[in-house]
Amino acid sequence: MVRSRWKGIYVAKELQNYNTVTNPTIVTTERSSVIVPYYLTKTIYVYNGRKYVGVKITEKSLGRKLGEYVLTKKVEKYKASGKSKKK
């Protein structure tokens, strides 16, 4: 579902008040925050439930959410067992 226009975009308070002059690394757990132009060319470390993953902000990522770039589940690949079936 799309967020109502009258509510505006959601940016976490911890990201709004972040001062990159004193602390250049931005670390957050707010995956639902929208990426705004203030964060262009910066790297934000987002928590995926296990570790912090770096997300580099570009012009293409503006208006999207931080959680779209951080996977929370491990991608499993099926491996061949190495045994061939006999006919």
Curated annotation (Swiss-Prot):
GO terms for cellular component: mitochondrial small ribosomal subunit. Keywords: Mitochondrion, Ribonucleoprotein, Ribosomal protein. InterPro entries: Ribosomal_uS19 (IPR002222), Ribosomal_uS19_CS (IPR020934), Ribosomal_uS19_SF (IPR023575). GO terms for molecular function: RNA binding; structural constituent of ribosome. One of its GO terms (biological process) is translation. It is found in: Mitochondrion. It holds the Pfam family Ribosomal_S19. Gene3D superfamilies: 30s Ribosomal Protein S19, Chain A (3.30.860.10). Belongs to the universal ribosomal protein uS19 family. This is Small ribosomal subunit protein uS19m. It comes from Dictyostelium discoideum. The lineage of its organism: Eukaryota, Amoebozoa, Evosea, Eumycetozoa, Dictyostelia. The gene is mrps19.
